From Swiss-Prot:
It comes from the Eukaryota. This is Hemoglobin subunit alpha-A/A'. GO terms for biological process: hydrogen peroxide catabolic process. Red blood cells. The lineage of its organism: Eukaryota, Metazoa, Chordata, Craniata, Vertebrata. It comes from Gyps rueppelli. CDD domains: Hb-alpha-like. Residues 1-141 form the Globin domain. GO terms for cellular component: blood microparticle; haptoglobin-hemoglobin complex; hemoglobin complex. The gene is HBAA. Pfam families: Globin.
Length: 141
């Protein structure tokens, strides 16, 4: 459960991220594909090379979904309901991949905004990413 302080921390971090959705999203995906190669299996039709237009476009969607969750931080489940349906029913993405993606996103945030990612903010952002992952996997059950 996100506390009021967690929500404030997450919203503050995302003020730094919003203008970089495509770049940070692409970097997150590239990092995930490199660090966890089995995650590539869900993207057989993508050009997975650095700078790929497909990676940039999907990265922008990923960060866009996170921004949507931040904008509706008191109702993440409602905000991401359609995305949850898509991943559970059509794409059937292994739920562990959301955790891996979240870890890679944290690294990207740390690289680009090291002074913002204090231990307290890191904990808040991690809790938020876990909450998003839980919403995206809730309909698997």
């Amino acid at each position: 459960v996100l506390s009021a302080n967690d929500k404030t921390n997450v919203k503050n971090v995302f003020t730094k991220i919003t203008g970089h959705a495509e770049d940070y999203g692409a970097e997150t995906l590239e990092r995930m594909f490199t660090t966890y190669p089995p995650t590539k299996t869900y993207f057989p039709h993508f050009d997975l090379h650095h700078g790929s237009a497909q990676i940039k476009a999907h990265g922008k969607k990923v960060v866009g979904a996170l921004i949507e969750a931040v904008n509706h931080i008191d109702d993440i489940a409602g905000a991401l309901s359609k995305l949850s349906d898509l991943h559970a029913q059509k794409l059937r993405v292994d739920p562990v991949n959301f955790k891996l993606l979240g870890q890679c996103f944290l690294v990207v945030v740390a690289i680009h905004h090291p002074s913002v990612l204090t231990p307290e903010v890191h904990a808040s952002l991690d809790k938020f990413l876990c909450a998003v992952g839980n919403v995206l996997t809730a309909k698997y059950r």
